[in-house]
Amino acid sequence: MSFSGLLRRHPRILWAAGLAVAGLVLYFCYLRQAQTYVLNSDPAGQALEAWAMWHGNPLLRGWWLGDISFYGVELPLNVIIEMVNGLRTEDVHILAALVYAAVVLLTALLARGTARGREGVVRALLAGGILLAPSLVYGTRVLIQGPNHTGTLIPILLTLLLLDRAPERWWVPAIVGVMLTWGQVNDPLATFAAAAAVAVASGVRVLQGIVRDGRTARTWWYDASLAVAALISVAAAHLVLAEIHTAGGFYAPPPKYGYGLAPLSTLPTRIHVAGSNILMLFGADFTSEPTAATKALAVLHLVGLALAVLGLLAGLRGFLGRADRVTQALVAGTIIVLAAGVFGHYMLPVVGAHEIVSVLPFSAVLAGRLLGGPLTRARLEPVLAIGLACYLGALAYNDTQPIATPAHQDLARWLEAHHLTSGLAGYWESTIVTLDSGGRVRLVALIGKGTTIKPYEADSSWSNPAVSRANFIVTVKWPLADAHQVRPAVVRARFGAPARTYHFREYRIMVYNYNLLTRATRPSLGGY
């Protein structure tokens, strides 16, 4: 049998090969775009966590994490990357590129669904195309920066793919429950975007079966089981995190602003901010795009946003009708996440886009699944091909921009050259310098103007004077937000006059002849 004949008889081979090639190309494109963003201490701290896991501390004993653990997706991936590449700033870019390439491919696969032939291709390319070229500034920051909700989309999309492709068997709800637990251990976003969405969609289908169709339990047991599995997964995720800590593992604090409702008086402001953040997610924001080229790209992304909105509206129209299970879950997940964002405390400019990131692939999948067929029947593939080519051009434009130097790399080199390897600094100068230096210089973050150790994305032993030492403090003159974190006058009042002081660019390095950890306030969180 010839190779072409083999492909005709086994088209899945062609699909698999195409996905592999597309994934590889997308990875290198997103790696190059990720390098245009200035790395800071947030992803650097998570890279250090993965380094500790790789070096004999898989439970991260003694670590203070953020309110998102990233323990299910990003940290394991980072461990693998660092096993191969070592502890380097490039690790963050590699992770971000791998994650986003996977999200784009999974979005395309989920949009394709069970469709075959031309319609299947149109569905996949339509959905994947909407995600294809994140905008250069905010798109890179929100989607290709490093650990920040995007990785959580992987278990969520895989769960929905399972629901889409698996037969209605008893074992599917059990696996779905495990996968939902996995996602929620990684990030609470999965509770709203996945667990609650599956529970709502399955509950609606059960009610439809009983009230509208008069079906018996023998026919609606599957959706009832999915709803129960989704609800159990919420408790299971909390139990897993608690058991990890009980076993001596990391401490993850509760969400910063809790799960309560924000005052209704601020609702108009939050709706406006949510709208701006949605534009950022889809690359259609104009506030950070000063050139004619980038403004044109923002206009182009408005087309993708319009298709996503149409897909969501089509999904809403069929939600209580004959929509399939995955479509109902996507609609429910989109509405739940948007409602949680608008009515909760997390809808802040730019950073709030992270909190609703699932809206991007969910609405793109809805566009692919619900608009792909009509567009194919209308023979609009040439128009879609032109749009896809424009998006590829936008991605190429992003990849030609200058590579950014990680923040404070000059400081890391200066400190190492002067044999200053263990000190204190503001948060934005702390873990990024540690990563910049490959771990040879360690800066522990301070808060309280320079008096208190910050218990966030750090090993508690770094600030324990019984086992660690710090003999200098770094302050900065600018930017003002960083300068206010550690104030020289407050440092002198708490730690006394330094033995000597160095000035290097915007940095002031105050060196002492004793262990500063003996005078720094050290909070006790999680028993550490």
Label every model-predicted segment.
Residues D67, Y71, G117-D164, N186, ...:
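Membrane-interface micro-motifs in multi-pass membrane enzymes
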Residues N148-P155, F192, K295-V309, D324-L375:
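Hydrophobic/aromatic-rich transmembrane helices and adjacent perimembrane loops
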Residues I94-R118, L158, L310-L313:
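Transmembrane-helix motifs of polytopic, lipid-linked glycan transferases
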Residues G45-W51, W64-L87, V273-S288:
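Short hydrophobic/aromatic helix or loop-helix immediately within or flanking a transmembrane segment
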Residues M53, I156-V172, G209:
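Membrane-interface transmembrane helices that cradle and orient dolichyl/undecaprenyl
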Residues V172-A195:
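Membrane-interface alpha helices of multi-pass inner-membrane proteins
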Residues R12-A22, V228, I232, A323, ...:
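Signature aromatic-anchored transmembrane alpha helix within multi-pass, membrane-resident enzymes
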Residues S2, R8-R9, R118, V206-S225, ...:
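Membrane-interface helix-loop-helix junctions at transmembrane boundaries of multi-pass membrane enzymes
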